[in-house]
Amino acid sequence: TSVMFDGSSFSFKENIRRTKKIVALAHKYHVSVEAELGAIAGIEDFVSVADRDAHLTDPKQAIEFVRATGCDALAIAIGTKHGAYKYTGDSILDFGRLKEIAECVDVPLVLHGASGIPSSIKKICTDYGCEISNAKGVSDAAVRKAVTLGVRKVNVDTDLRLAFDAGIRKFLKERPEVIDPREILKT
């Protein structure tokens, strides 16, 4: 069992204070805590972070943050983005920053906003009415490289949402007579 706390919208000191409090409570119950340092651009849970407001994780702050909070895993910002429209060109991740952080902290690193937007899922979505033709995600090669450099957990929520959306849209097109949500969700 684990908790993910994203205090990245707070100041560095406030993020430490809040994360430390959550870690203390969670650890009483043997629950691990993933914390976030650095702001990832894009839209997540109806919260939008503009590219200009996103900032990459500072390796020196990562050291201080992990030591001060006692978090069990650290989600870092190295250039990924939340949502389906991450990039207009190829994904550009700061692998040097990732390597530096991995070398100086002793907790697993997490990559948020790492969905790849697979073309196979994108095609099903667009074939059945979803308007995501310009969606572009993190490349498989970039994710593989991040893992070789120290990332131990990769979050791909947008890919899961798109796969769900594709399946539902396809089912409803092929079986328009079905109106029971329980039947739809069984597929």
PLM regions with names:
Residues 1-108, 116-136, 140-148, 169:
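Alpha/beta enzyme core
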Residues 112:
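Glycine-rich anion-binding loops and their surrounding alpha/beta cores
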Residues 127-132, 138-187:
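C-terminal alpha-helical cap/extension of soluble enzyme domains
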